[in-house]
Amino acid sequence: MDMNRLTQKSQEALQEAQTAAGRMGHTEVDGEHLLLALLDQEDGLIPRLLQQAGTEPKELRAAVREELSHRPKATGPGAAPGQVFVTQRLARLLDAAEREAKRLKDEYVSVEHLLLALAEESSSTAAGLLLKQAGITRDSFLSALTQVRGNQRVTSANPEVAYEALEKYGRDLVLEARSGRLDPVIGRDAEIRRVTQILSRKTKNNPVLIGDPGVGKTAIVEGLAQRIVRGDVPEGLRDKTVFALDMGSLVAGAKYRGEFEERLKAVLSEVKAAEGRILLFVDELHTVVGAGAAEGAMDAGNMLKPMLARGELHMIGATTLDEYRKHIEKDAALERRFQQVLVDEPSVEDTISILRGLRERLEVFHGVKIQDTALVSAATLSHRYITDRFLPDKAIDLVDEACARLRTEIDSMPAELDEITRRVTRLEIEEAALSKESDPASKTRLEELRRELADLRGEADAKHAQWEAERQAIRRVQELRQELEQVRHEAEEAERAYDLNRAAELRYGRLQDLERRLAAEEEQLAAKQGENRLLREVVTEEEIAEIVAAWTGIPVARLQEGEREKLLRLDEILRERVIGQDEAVKLVTDAIIRARSGIRDPRRPIGSFIFLGPTGVGKTELAKTLARTLFDSEENMVRLDMSEYQERHTVSRLMGAPPGYVGYEEGGQLTEAVRRKPYSVVLFDEIEKAHTDVFNTLLQILDDGRITDAQGRTVDFRNTVIIMTSNIGSEHLLDGATAEGEIKPDARALVMGELRGHFRPEFLNRVDDIVLFKPLGERQIERIVELQFDELRQRLAERRITVELTDAGREVIAHQGYDPVYGARPLRRYISHEVETLVGRALLRGDVQDGATVRVDAEHGELVVTYDQPEDVKGAWAA
């Protein structure tokens, strides 16, 4: 027999038969070895055919192994390992298989021909007897083969690819809907109706669903499958089935030229043979264009066109707007064969309805209860804060993750119990150490420790018992919910089959009984938990808000008591750091309070301010302090020095370079920073130095609270505080300040006039407040000196060195280090030169030891720094 006429799987089976014979110590490879190899083949056709014929392959495999185990084995010095001979019977079997292939008009000898040859053998052979005992005859096997193979012939070395191609490379959505595996589809009636209209057409009956990712395109097709199951479709669609084709598995593993085309042709042949009963659904339709195309090969899109044009193939596609434009619209011949169905993002109200429909499924899966307020919160918060994704997908994800978080907490040890367990472990280690000591103090401590341990162990046991009881109760509730859903599904099936007795028994018998038991279990669980519950099994709006905060970094949870107090005291906290600028502090604080209390305009930033004033009066310091107070870190401040944006070509760096330019992939310095930290202070330092085109960019941010970057992504600025600092008119503020530090009305008018001369009206009109910073007086400078020394104290605290500043020293530093033109900035330089340098030298020389006290004083108008060592060793030097 010509071995080249064997298919790939047949050759593998013969090779495996030879290997099995050698492994078992047999010198000859026979028909039983071949039968075992056919049964053992991974993803093989024979086990599937035997199951179709009503035989269990595992039992037959065990019987063949049992038979082979009784055969004589070649052992000892005369045995030649690895040397296996083919029996005459096996050679005759191969010839018989070749005859079977000719009889079936096949070009290659496949595995089914080999099994037919084995089934044709008489009962005198072990293989023939075992197959007959298993109920496999030539006729029964041919019947099963016809069901799987249809009218296809073996024309290639890998024919299994073409058998049951739809089952292999697709999912039957109607079957899944009938078995209750699909989630319910709420709404989308207009889109499903439009799809059914297009499918009912004579030609060009191929709808393509186009919409943003996550709006529910696939759900529409699942909804159609569910309607087909319910019979809620036109007469022409009643007996149809929907197969979702998986392009990934169709392409995966296609190693050789033509293998992909062969698989797709097999799928299309099955669809054609079904004579319109199969609707083919291709998710991500754009993957069809170019799929499988290599040099000289035809891509999937071109293979589909003839069948689509003739109406032999009913296809439903789904893709996004961008992918449709990029791939499908370029191929006009393919595009005209599809009818577009645009799928818009649902409204918040529709999303809430969708979530209510999915609630029961999520509750059953996670074993938790979801409050209706949590669903409303998920829809509204995701719409408001997660702007780069689409409803209902992002809202469903929120609820799903909130449920998963609670489920994880239920399965993990509660924090209270975990803390007690850790304390018990720590005390047990201490007990083991103290038990080795013999002194009276250790013995006394040991007795106390053992009493404490006994109390803690008792508490831990009680908590553990409570935890287990609550977990068991939650598990019972979950099992009842699952059973309830199963009974509902069975009742629906019975109603579809018009088995009204069964439906009535389920609906008015078991279903009501289960609902009563579930209500009783939930009451029992609530009573068990009481006030001192360890586990939470109800998803509330608080959990949803926590997930949103974790995703976006925006604190959307309801204000906690501590945060409420902090916000009410925000102006006091800011005044501790920003000295002498009460008006600026009040305006900024009011904006934050309006935002966090939820009464501001949700379409604009939290607040936008222009800070005007001379250098060194606290404009940048206020922005830093605000970031530190609100977000616990100055890292949440996006600072842009506008002197870097003086030229026109540098403006593109804010939003990213346009396509085709270097740096396009990196995004903009402003937009990327805000995308990563959407809840932050954005500081545009020295705004007057920026190019005028920068203000065109800022107009949209200030008015709409959003901007589109170079890559087309919308960046949300609605949760940012925008601060722009400027030195415009600072000379008027310096000259026009009263002795008390107040700004004269005429000086204010001059500053505003100069401001209007520099910035356009449409820009100034969009800013919430223009804040004038007053020049600092000597009293404020003295308070700033104290703040600077607080920073020095913190730096020296690691070495336990304390710094004392006398009133005289403070006055000298304030007098020497202050310049009205430069503000408070020279203070830092003065302290650095006159104090920090001297202390640094003393530390290096060893004059100041750890634990010493450094005193900064003044004598005769000169600064004097002295130090006290812990051993009362003193030294002094004049500055």
UniProtKB/Swiss-Prot annotation:
Location of region: NBD2: 563-775
Gene3D superfamilies: 1.10.8.60, Clp, N-terminal domain (1.10.1780.10), P-loop containing nucleotide triphosphate hydrolases (3.40.50.300)
Region (Repeat 1): 6-71
GO molecular function, one term: ATP binding
GO process annotations (BP): cellular response to heat; protein refolding
Pfam families: AAA, AAA_2, AAA_lid_9, Clp_N, ClpB_D2-small
Region (Repeat 2): 86-151
Annotated ATP 2 binding sites: G613, P614, T615, G616, V617, G618, K619, T620
Domain of life: Bacteria
Keyword Oxidoreductase: no
Coiled-coil spans in chain: 396-530
Domain Clp R span(s) in chain numbering: 3-151
Chain spans, region NBD1: 164-345
Keywords: ATP-binding, Chaperone, Coiled coil, Cytoplasm, Nucleotide-binding, Repeat, Stress response
Free-text function comment from the UniProt entry: Part of a stress-induced multi-chaperone system, it is involved in the recovery of the cell from heat-induced damage, in cooperation with DnaK, DnaJ and GrpE. Acts before DnaK, in the processing of protein aggregates. Protein binding stimulates the ATPase activity; ATP hydrolysis unfolds the denatured protein aggregates, which probably helps expose new hydrophobic binding sites on the surface of ClpB-bound aggregates, contributing to the solubilization and refolding of denatured protein aggregates by DnaK.
Record remark: domains: The Clp repeat (R) domain probably functions as a substrate-discriminating domain, recruiting aggregated proteins to the ClpB hexamer and/or stabilizing bound proteins. The NBD2 domain is responsible for oligomerization, whereas the NBD1 domain stabilizes the hexamer probably in an ATP-dependent manner. The movement of the coiled-coil domain is essential for ClpB ability to rescue proteins from an aggregated state, probably by pulling apart large aggregated proteins, which are bound between the coiled-coils motifs of adjacent ClpB subunits in the functional hexamer.
Name of the protein: Chaperone protein ClpB 2
